[in-house]
Amino acid sequence: GCGTLFPDTMVRTTTRMTGRDMKLTIESMTYGADGLAHADNGKAVFVQGAVAGDTVEAEVVQDGKSFMRARTTEILEPSPDRIQPPCPFVGICGGCSWGNLSRTAQLAAKEQNLRSTLERIGKFAPEQVDELVQPICHTKDDWGYRNKIELEPTVVNGRVRLGMHGVDPSKIVTVDTCPLFDKRFPKALKSVVGALNYLSGSHNLGLERVGIRASRRTKALEVALWTPTGSFPRSQVSRVLADAAHPTSIVRVMSKGEKKARRVSKVEMLAGEGSWTENIAEGQMRLSAPSFFQVNTKGAEILIELVMEALDPQEDELAVDLYCGAGTFTLPLARRCDFVAAVEAYGPAVRDL
């Protein structure tokens, strides 16, 4: 873990600049990955690789007129809220940038960020913020809760490998484990990565990305391969993936168009059910690979409960769900209302609904 990369060497609570190196005490967490500190001249410093409460040595990588950006080179005094995460890629992979921070501190930081935004940007008075901001509703799981992960291809020593975007988004970090992914499927990621690495040695798969969805409730496991249109070794890919990961569904999502505006052309079933199912809020949803669904099923249920509580829908009422997606709120509303009008422009989500 990243906590072991920077040994404790001394305690210093003041902030001073030494050439292009600075000694900083991190005051809070910002939106995104960075910790916030201030230089002696009062300029804000966004610090990569640090958490609130850390005292660090940091190298300035950008010095702007109103703020600076810096990269942690050494943790001098760790925050009492710093933890040893279960993932060895925290601080390298860009997927869990707060992984070194305790859950309690994460929740407090998110609430403080919201309060600060309402005051600074929304111009709400502190007493109004106190009334508006309620305690955070959250799930119990710190790790092992994600029902979906996505992998990006990269070339290592002339061979295609799969990984995740790094802290530097231009780089791909090759991984074969992710403690954020559903803990009921501990071998799924490694099996899929191994199978596709093997296939890439003898076939040009043209992979643009790979999606893996898992449900502990339905036991559904889907592997989605995003590729351009054209020829594809369907039988070999489906056979190797089935033997390695035993998914309930293997699909190929074909896309076309300019790189920054790719659109889904077709979803092709290679093996199994051709879709992914999840039980949620007293119902079941069936989703195709391109459709969006909250990556935290229990978190989605909390959102549904809050919305239903606020709306208090009645049997004789009509409801309109705008930007409804595949129906996360539409379906619970339909079980409570007389009629629901669902509005959505994205084709795959409309077909799923």
Locate each region found by the language model.
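Rossmann-like S-adenosyl-L-methionine
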Residues: C2-G3, R12-T25, Y31, F232-L353
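Terminal RNA-binding accessory module
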Residues: T9-F89, E119, P169
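Short, conserved phosphate/pyrophosphate- and ester-handling motifs at nucleotide-, phospho-/glycolipid
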Residues: G53, F181, N296
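Hydrophobic beta-strand signal
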Residues: E57-E59, E150, V320
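Extended interfacial segments that mediate partner engagement and assembly in macromolecular machines
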Residues: T73-P85, G91-L205, R217
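Nucleotide donor/acceptor-binding cores
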Residues: N147, L221, D316-E317
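Short, aliphatic-rich beta-strand segments
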Residues: R217-P228, Q284-S288
